[in-house]
Amino acid sequence: IIECNFSCPQMVGEGLGSDVGTDPQLVAKYTAATKKGTTLPVLAKMTPNITKMEVPAEAAVRAGADGLAAINTIKSVMNINLQTFSSAPDVDGKSPEGGYSGKAVKPIALRFINDMAKDENLKGVPISGMGGIETWRDAAEFLALGCETVQVTTSVMQYGYRIIGEMIGGMQDYLAQNGMTSVRQTIGKALP
């Protein structure tokens, strides 16, 4: 799988980073170019720095994306060093913006996943969910809103790979307690 990151908040400049994800024409252009160069499945990673994620998501699918991934980090200024009056982290004075991730972004991620899953033009398009997943319950919520897979990065960086085993164990217990035999039985259950 190739995941096209149309949402990196660390790249600043017109037509770069998360700006790509806000422009359906650029999303379509880069998705089509990627599809032309590979036979691997292509996911378009959407930016949360937008009001209606469905618009660029639809452009990605029309251009050939095999699925969507959401969400990336939220563009932010983490803090200001009150001694130097520069942003932190400061990379040669050129990095005032960064990406905010972790548990706090989960409700935002779920909202965007919900919107895309309900969009008529995106019906049947696989979604890989991410954003604030720390526990099996978090992962299950993304699945319940229609995600076929989930991705976990910040939590692994914070707590180590052990959390993956805990997620698997928790999900197995949940399935058994609820008479289910496959995680696929939870996908989309929270959708109308």
Cite the ranges covered by each PLM segment:
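Conserved, mostly hydrophobic/aromatic
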Residues: 4, 45, 68, 116, ...
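Glycine-rich phosphate-binding active-site loops on the catalytic face of alpha/beta enzymes
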Residues: 6-10, 63, 67-78, 132-133, ...
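Glycine/Thr-rich beta-alpha phosphate-binding loop at enzyme active sites
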Residues: 9-25, 56, 63-125
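Generic structural signal for well-ordered alpha-helices
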Residues: 24-32, 54-58, 110-114, 139, ...
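Short beta-strand/loop segments at the ligand-binding rim of alpha/beta enzyme cores
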Residues: 36-47, 118-130
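Active-site glycine- and acidic-residue-rich loops that bind
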Residues: 41-67
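C-terminal helical cap(s) of enzyme catalytic domains, especially alpha/beta-barrels
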Residues: 79-98, 143, 156-180
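Extended, intrinsically disordered, low-complexity segments
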Residues: 106, 169-192
